[in-house]
């Protein structure tokens, strides 16, 4: 079973701010999920061929195409925080991660 400290670490890595009640609840739920995966790992899959999808699909992605967009100023004006000829986006990576 996961303890509250492990749940806090998972929440930190997922950038979630959770309450102490949620820590307790998530500890139980995540433990149940891990127990289920443990059961799945006990299954005999010796003669089961590997698959990438449960249902075979083909042509599920479109071909990439390049088109010039001639009104660059209009596009930049739609951005919430343009900086010169670029889009300024929020920082998502920290260097002080564990």
Curated annotation (Swiss-Prot):
Keywords: ATP-binding, Ligase, Nucleotide-binding, Protein biosynthesis. Pfam families: GatC. It is an enzyme of class 6 (ligase). It catalyses: L-glutamyl-tRNA(Gln) + L-glutamine + ATP + H2O = L-glutaminyl-tRNA(Gln) + L-glutamate + ADP + phosphate + H(+); L-aspartyl-tRNA(Asn) + L-glutamine + ATP + H2O = L-asparaginyl-tRNA(Asn) + L-glutamate + ADP + phosphate + 2 H(+). One of its GO terms (biological process) is translation. It comes from the Bacteria. GO terms for molecular function: asparaginyl-tRNA synthase (glutamine-hydrolyzing) activity; ATP binding; glutaminyl-tRNA synthase (glutamine-hydrolyzing) activity. Residues 77-98 are annotated as: Disordered. Its EC number is 6.3.5.-. InterPro entries: Asp/Glu-ADT_sf_sub_c (IPR036113), GatC (IPR003837). Gene3D superfamilies: Glu-tRNAGln amidotransferase C subunit, N-terminal domain. Allows the formation of correctly charged Asn-tRNA(Asn) or Gln-tRNA(Gln) through the transamidation of misacylated Asp-tRNA(Asn) or Glu-tRNA(Gln) in organisms which lack either or both of asparaginyl-tRNA or glutaminyl-tRNA synthetases. The reaction takes place in the presence of glutamine and ATP through an activated phospho-Asp-tRNA(Asn) or phospho-Glu-tRNA(Gln). Belongs to the GatC family. Heterotrimer of A, B and C subunits. This is Aspartyl/glutamyl-tRNA(Asn/Gln) amidotransferase subunit C. It comes from Crocosphaera subtropica (strain ATCC 51142 / BH68). The gene is gatC.
